[in-house]
Swiss-Prot record:
An example molecular function term from Gene Ontology annotations: oxygen carrier activity
Keyword Plastid assigned: no
Protein name: Hemocyanin subunit 2
Cysteine-cysteine disulfides: none
Alphabetical keyword list: Copper, Oxygen transport, Secreted, Transport
Tissue/organ expression: Hemolymph.
Domain of life: Eukaryota
An example Gene Ontology CC term for this record: extracellular space
Function: Hemocyanins are copper-containing oxygen carriers occurring freely dissolved in the hemolymph of many mollusks and arthropods.
Localisation: Secreted, Extracellular space
Family from the record: Belongs to the tyrosinase family. Hemocyanin subfamily.
Originating organism: Liocarcinus depurator
Transmembrane stretches, start-end: none
Amino acid sequence: DAPGGASDAQKQ
């Protein structure tokens, strides 16, 4: 995925 905290939040 693209770099970014928001993206990481969805993954978890």
